[in-house]
C-alpha cells in the first residue's frame, strides 16, 4: 500500500452477518492479544512506527491513561512523508494532461468477498457496460484518449475484453497518472500520486459494489472533497460547469496532503 492513503474500517455486509462477525472477531482479538502479550513482555514491542497520518500521530502524544501507562505496543512513533512525495521530490516525472485515466477495481477479490458472496457475472457485465459508457462520454467531451490502469494482480486478458475500445495497461499506473487530465478510480492508494500532482479526480460507485467498496471511495470524497459519480444514474454533463467543478475541487486537496501525505 502507498503510505498516505486514508485507512478505513471494513465492516460486515447486510445479509452476511457471520462473515462480518468472524472477520471483526479475528481482527480485533488478534490486535488486542498482541497488545496484551507485548505489555506482559511475552512478545517484544515495536521500537518505532513510521506514520504519514498526523491525526494518529497527535493521538499517540495525547495525555490519557493509555499513553501515560505506556500500554501501546509501539514505543515511539515518527512522522514521515509519503513514498509518493519522496519519489516526486527526487525524480520529477513528465507531467501533462493528454489522457483520461481509469484505475479499475477488482470487484471479486478475497478482500471484498470475505464479507459477501461473489458478484454474479451478469451484474459485472452490466457494471462495465455503464462504466465504458461514461468513459466514452468523457473521451468525446474532452477529446482525450482513455487509458485503463490495472492492479498488478488483476486479470489483464479479461479486462481487455471489457475495455476493448480503450488502451489497457498494467504496472504503469504512476506514469499514466502523470499524463492524466482526469483520474477516475474506485478505491486505490495509487491516487496519492494524483493528489500530489493536483489532478482532477472522480471516484466511481455503482449498485454492484458492496458497502466496503463504496466506502473506500467515499473516504476520499470526505477527506479530500473528490467528486463522486454513480454510473447507475442518468449522466448529463455540461462541459464548462463540469470542468469548473473539477478545478474547484483540486483547491481542496491541501488539507488532505498536509494531514496525510506530507505532515
Label every PLM stretch briefly.
Residues 102, 126-170, 217-224:
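Catalytic donor nucleotide-activated moiety binding site of glycosyltransferases and closely related
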Residues 86-110:
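Nucleotide-sugar donor-binding and catalytic loop/hinge architecture
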Residues 1-89, 191:
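Active-site and donor-binding regions of nucleotide-sugar-utilizing enzymes
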Residues 82, 144-197, 201:
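Donor nucleotide-activated moiety binding/catalytic core segment of transferases
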Residues 48, 99, 181-182:
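Structural motif
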Residues 160-164, 189-262:
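Catalytic binding pocket for nucleotide-activated donors in carbohydrate/polymer assembly enzymes
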Amino acid at each position: 500500500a502507498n503510505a498516505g492513503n486514508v485507512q478505513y474500517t471494513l465492516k460486515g455486509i447486510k445479509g452476511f452477518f457471520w462473515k462480518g462477525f468472524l472477520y471483526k472477531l479475528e481482527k480485533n482479538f488478534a490486535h488486542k492479544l498482541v497488545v496484551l502479550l507485548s505489555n506482559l513482555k511475552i512478545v517484544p514491542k515495536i521500537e518505532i512506527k513510521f506514520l504519514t497520518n498526523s491525526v494518529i500521530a497527535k493521538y499517540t502524544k495525547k495525555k490519557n491513561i493509555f499513553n501515560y501507562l505506556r500500554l501501546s505496543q509501539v514505543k515511539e512513533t515518527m512522522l514521515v512523508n509519503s513514498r509518493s512525495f519522496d519519489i516526486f521530490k527526487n525524480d520529477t516525472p513528465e507531467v501533462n494532461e493528454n489522457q483520461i485515466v481509469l484505475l479499475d477495481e477488482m470487484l471479486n477479490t478475497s478482500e471484498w468477498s470475505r464479507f459477501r458472496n461473489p458478484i454474479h457475472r451478469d451484474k459485472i457485465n452490466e457494471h462495465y457496460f455503464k462504466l465504458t459508457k461514461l468513459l466514452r462520454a468523457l473521451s468525446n467531451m474532452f477529446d482525450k484518449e482513455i487509458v485503463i490502469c490495472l492492479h498488478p494482480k488483476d486479470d489483464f486478458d479479461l479486462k481487455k475484453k471489457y475495455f476493448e475500445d480503450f488502451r489497457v495497461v498494467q504496472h504503469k499506473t504512476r506514469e499514466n497518472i502523470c499524463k492524466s487530465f482526469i483520474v477516475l478510480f474506485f478505491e486505490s492508494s495509487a491516487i496519492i500520486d494524483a493528489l500530489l500532482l493536483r489532478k482532477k479526480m472522480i471516484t466511481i460507485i455503482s449498485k454492484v459494489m458492496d458497502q466496503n467498496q463504496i466506502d473506500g471511495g467515499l473516504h476520499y470524497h470526505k477527506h479530500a472533497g473528490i467528486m463522486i459519480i454513480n454510473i447507475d444514474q442518468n449522466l448529463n454533463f455540461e462541459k464548462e460547469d463540469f470542468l469548473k467543478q473539477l478545478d474547484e475541487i483540486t483547491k481542496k486537496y491541501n488539507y488532505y496532503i498536509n494531514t496525510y501525505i506530507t505532515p
